[in-house]
């Protein structure tokens, strides 16, 4: 069976480079004040281009991921998505909008809840409906959950209980240490996933099949160049839309956390679709790699970067979760440990995760 990341065409789809290129041009002209910044039509067009650029970047990352194989391919996709996430968060933090000290926390928390409850819930429900019971490598899930639980607790829970900084915030030295610990721990996990215990993270069918190949050697080179173009488009469009997004949420009277949920939802949409497709093909191990990899990268990469921005520029960075979100995180990690603790899943576990995700969305809009 071909890998789920198999590239079936030697031709680069037109949309995958036209949208990022057009997005770069529109964003650059607007930021240079050639086009009107407050135009509603332009902002709506930019939002559509941002979504398209996210899909394009993940598409090109998938081409590269197919060349390197699993589990490295899942890592590449997760890092690509996290770069986009960091770019959007950084743009909002530097925009000067009210509440921007909380956007990193809200986005990272939303990303964890979306992938661990929304995406994994859909994977288990749809995959279980088609294949009844699905299996995956228990060692892989255990290793990832151990790191994820530690990083989430240190980054999102501990700030509520330290006394050296402001409420829900680390002091500068604490923030530096937590950032370094996150980078090191995530780096060790990547070493285990790609070198020391690589076999833990490989699907049985992937191990038995030869690596995916492309019809032309030009594909990876073109994909690499277009991936850079797509990421640049995302960064420029994020800078353009950062202030209007904050203003829209405020005008609608919604909590600031909705900004984080929106960012995480847009960024994770393509990868979520890929994960669900893998589950439908009875490749649950690939889905688990993508889901847990995204959650780990979201904390292990995003937190150190925003911590560096905060310390370097002297900006406040609130990371501690509100009480209701703290309960939701603990519940998610607890249920996730049970769900992924046997190596086999059914529709029931997926339904539980979707129920938690529904409550998370409710609390995001109505705390």
Swiss-Prot record:
The keyword Cell membrane applies. The chain crosses the membrane at residues 12-32, 39-59, 74-94, 108-128, 143-163, 172-192, 221-241, 249-269, 291-311, 318-338, 347-367. It is a multi-pass membrane protein. Keywords: Cell membrane, Ion transport, Membrane, Plasmid, Transmembrane, Transmembrane helix, Transport. Possible cation transporter. It comes from the Bacteria. GO terms for cellular component: plasma membrane. Signal peptide: none annotated. One of its GO terms (molecular function) is sodium:proton antiporter activity. Belongs to the Ca(2+):cation antiporter (CaCA) (TC 2.A.19) family. It is found in: Cell membrane. This is Putative ionic transporter y4hA.
